[in-house]
From Swiss-Prot:
One of its GO terms (molecular function) is histidinol-phosphate transaminase activity. Keywords: Amino-acid biosynthesis, Aminotransferase, Histidine biosynthesis, Pyridoxal phosphate, Transferase. Pathway: Amino-acid biosynthesis; L-histidine biosynthesis; L-histidine from 5-phospho-alpha-D-ribose 1-diphosphate: step 7/9. It comes from Bacillus subtilis (strain 168). Homodimer. GO terms for biological process: L-histidine biosynthetic process. The modification N6-(pyridoxal phosphate)lysine is found at K223. Its EC number is 2.6.1.9. This is Histidinol-phosphate aminotransferase. The lineage of its organism: Bacteria, Bacillati, Bacillota, Bacilli, Bacillales. The keyword Coiled coil does not apply. Belongs to the class-II pyridoxal-phosphate-dependent aminotransferase family. Histidinol-phosphate aminotransferase subfamily. PANTHER family: HISTIDINOL-PHOSPHATE AMINOTRANSFERASE (PTHR43643:SF3), HISTIDINOL-PHOSPHATE AMINOTRANSFERASE 2 (PTHR43643).
């Protein structure tokens, strides 16, 4: 047996240590995970209630077309039902896009550092990955990304807000880019953290789909909606584009539980508003801490912050781990002296910041 040569350069995704494993290893009773940008307030109670009926139907396959969720989401977004594609998390939509458009005779353009699954899936398909460095402020350099496009370019990825910096692409920048990018090139706008955005110049992207048939938007129920365990993501695009990539989607790829919970979660926008309000207050806690200690903290439009501590990130990560706080070391994210920290509850933020103050 011979595996693809380009697959040998990849490593499996390494998730953070589970809470129970950290408790056992360090003899801790309490461990707080602020590493994976999960919602510290959980999910809507309505979503939990929606699972009760579906739990009795586990012997039955889910609706492979996600019809009920499709109808509800299309109304929420004011788009046609045929403009949607669903995935086992938005990660699967990324995989579907790469399956559909990339091979060893093509290339794809992405920022760096950014969400790693764009590159990971492109490499699996054998495509060349052209990585364009972020600007000093942590945002995408769209002019440089545009210059990297050639006749073999199939897909350009824009992560906005960007993971791991939390920065975003403004409306003016995005529109200027879309006007200049060749119409034959697919532009994927990953908006996993869309619900957390409060910037006034952030673009309303869904209406742009009527003008740009080469634009695709990715969103998820894993972050603000708090349904990470159920893995429901979706893509929005021109219905012809959706029709073309649907054959690359696996059958029954979103569960009965996920579909039911997502529908209920959409109906509880008050929960989302509450989470965003508390998240904004939490962000300010970190901004104040960074200012007090003279640290660089990227302004974030997400539920996480990236702070440069000017010392090896792995050392800080380990020190926090031993105290019962799991964060994300920037060493694996392209920021070797920074930590990416999920915004927790007010109390969680206070506790971890107090520990960091002691360490500093």
């Amino acid at each position: 047996m011979r595996i693809k040569e380009h697959l040998k350069q990849l490593k499996p995704y390494q998730p953070g240590k589970p809470i129970e494993a950290v408790k056992s290893e360090y003899g801790l009773d309490k461990v707080v995970k602020l590493a994976s940008n999960e919602n510290p307030y959980g999910c809507s109670e309505a979503a939990k209630e929606a699972l009760h009926h579906e739990i009795q139907q586990l012997a039955l396959y889910p609706d492979g077309y996600s019809a009920a969720l499709r109808t509800r989401l299309s109304k929420h977004l004011n788009v046609s039902e045929t403009s949607l594609i669903f995935g086992n998390g938005s990660d699967e939509i990324i995989q579907i896009i790469c399956r559909a458009f990339l091979n060893d005779k093509t290339n794809t353009v992405t920022a760096a550092p950014t969400f790693p699954q764009y590159k990971h899936n492109a490499v699996i398909e054998g495509a060349e990955v052209r990585e364009i460095a972020l600007r000093p402020d942590g945002s995408h350099d769209l002019d440089a990304m545009l210059e990297a496009i050639d006749e073999q370019t199939q897909v350009v990825w824009i992560c906005s807000p960007n993971n791991p910096t939390g920065t975003y692409t403004s409306e003016g920048e995005l529109l200027a880019f879309l006007e200049r990018v060749p119409s034959r090139v697919l532009v994927v706008l990953d908006e996993a953290y869309y619900e957390y955005v409060t910037a006034e110049d952030y673009p309303e992207t869904v209406p742009l789909l009527s003008k740009y048939s080469n634009l695709m938007i990715l969103r998820t129920f894993s972050k603000a909606y708090g349904l990470a365990a159920l893995r429901v993501g979706y893509g929005i695009a021109d219905e012809n584009l959706i029709r073309q990539i649907e054959p690359a989607r696996e059958p029954f790829n979103t569960s009965r539980l996920g579909q039911a919970a997502a529908i209920a979660a959409l109906d509880d926008q008050a929960f989302i508003a509450s989470c965003v309000e508390q998240n904004n207050a939490g962000l300010q806690q970190y901004y104040d801490f960074a200012k007090t200690h003279g640290l660089k903290c990227y302004p974030s439009q997400t539920n996480f912050v990236l702070i440069d501590f000017k010392r090896p990130a792995d050392e800080l990560f380990q020190a926090l781990l031993e105290k019962g706080y799991i964060v994300r070391s920037g060493n694996a994210l392209g920021f070797p002296t920074s930590l990416r920290i999920t915004i927790g509850t007010k109390e969680q933020n206070e506790e971890i910041l107090a520990i960091l103050a002691e360490i500093l």
